[in-house]
Structure formats: C-alpha cells, structure tokens
Amino acid sequence: RIPSTEEVVVRTESG
C-alpha cells in the first residue's frame, strides 16, 4: 500500500 504523508513524517521524526 502507499504510505500517507503523515505516516512518512512520523517515521522521519521517529528516527
């Protein structure tokens, strides 16, 4: 599935 922009942001902040 295609991850939404919010999901990508959360993953980036999680780093």
UniProtKB/Swiss-Prot annotation:
Keywords recorded for this protein, A-Z: Hydrolase, Serine esterase
E.C. numbers: 3.1.1.59
Enzyme's top EC category: hydrolase
Superkingdom of origin: Eukaryota
Reactions listed under catalytic activity: juvenile hormone I + H2O = juvenile hormone I carboxylate + methanol + H(+); juvenile hormone III + H2O = juvenile hormone III carboxylate + methanol + H(+)
GO molecular function, one term: juvenile-hormone esterase activity
Function: JH esterase plays a crucial role in the decrease of JH activity in lepidopteran insects, by hydrolyzing the methyl ester of JH. It is also involved in the transport of JH.
Protein family membership: Belongs to the type-B carboxylesterase/lipase family.
Official protein name in the record: Juvenile hormone esterase
Organism: Manduca sexta (Tobacco hawkmoth)
